[in-house]
Amino acid sequence: MIEPLHTAPPLLAAHALAFSRNEEPVFGPLDFHVDAGEALLVQGDNGAGKTTLLRVLAGLLHVEHGQIQIDGKTAKRGDRSRFMAYLGHLPGLKADLSTLENLHFLCGLHGRRAKQMPGSALAIVGLAGYEDALVRQLSAGQRKRLALARLWLSPAPLWLLDEPYANLDLDGITLVNRMISAHLRGGGAALVTTHGAYAAPPVRTRMLTLEAAA
């Protein structure tokens, strides 16, 4: 007798997910999933709820309606934060620490074992030679690159990237796409929000379009 094939559950799945603010709907209900090795590009105009969606998934906002599953199991808020790496509009860096000190501090803060040494991560994002530079001395684009280095050090399988192309030049945009592609090849997944035309999605990319609530 031939045994039936067992397909792995999605890395992340959302069922009837919805969010409201002051009784006004922000998004949803939404049903979507992301498999290992896949990126989901979340598009929509400003006010469509892209940032809010990522914050809900990351556990920064409470799930009001619907369900979030990780590997086929309902995920509690704390479980999601350990499973996901979130890159938001603000880099969340310590302005009076150096770039290298920031990476060491953040790795220790989250109790995570870095998958590469912080110095190597700086080189990957084009900040080699800036190890001792204070964050407050960096440009907006350099701060974004430092935030990308922190992301690269995270062992989290799912990346939540909110407008990762903002404040980056063409080289920076190419860097983001390369990082996403490498993460997917390693078995990770990514949700990427954008409302511009900068994104050149890597392989195995699907689209989710959000519309602003009427």
UniProtKB/Swiss-Prot annotation:
Subcellular location: Cell inner membrane
Residues that coordinate or bind ATP: G44, D45, N46, G47, A48, G49, K50, T51
GO cellular component: a single term: plasma membrane
Xref: InterPro entries: AAA+_ATPase (IPR003593), ABC_transporter-like_ATP-bd (IPR003439), ABC_transporter-like_CS (IPR017871), ABC_transptr_haem_export_CcmA (IPR005895), P-loop_NTPase (IPR027417)
Predominant cellular place of this UniProt entry's protein: membrane
Organism domain of life: Bacteria
Membrane topology annotation: Peripheral membrane protein
Coiled coil regions in record: none
Catalytic activity as recorded in UniProt: heme b(in) + ATP + H2O = heme b(out) + ADP + phosphate + H(+)
GO biological process: cytochrome complex assembly
Record domain ABC transporter: where: 12-214
Single GO MF annotation: ATP hydrolysis activity
EC number: 7.6.2.5
Key words, A-Z: ATP-binding, Cell inner membrane, Cell membrane, Cytochrome c-type biogenesis, Membrane, Nucleotide-binding, Translocase, Transport
Similarity-based family: Belongs to the ABC transporter superfamily. CcmA exporter (TC 3.A.1.107) family.
Subunit structure: The complex is composed of two ATP-binding proteins (CcmA) and two transmembrane proteins (CcmB).
Role noted for this protein: Part of the ABC transporter complex CcmAB involved in the biogenesis of c-type cytochromes; once thought to export heme, this seems not to be the case, but its exact role is uncertain. Responsible for energy coupling to the transport system.
Name listed for the protein in its UniProt record: Cytochrome c biogenesis ATP-binding export protein CcmA
Taxonomic classification: Bacteria, Pseudomonadati, Pseudomonadota, Gammaproteobacteria, Lysobacterales
Gene coding for it: ccmA
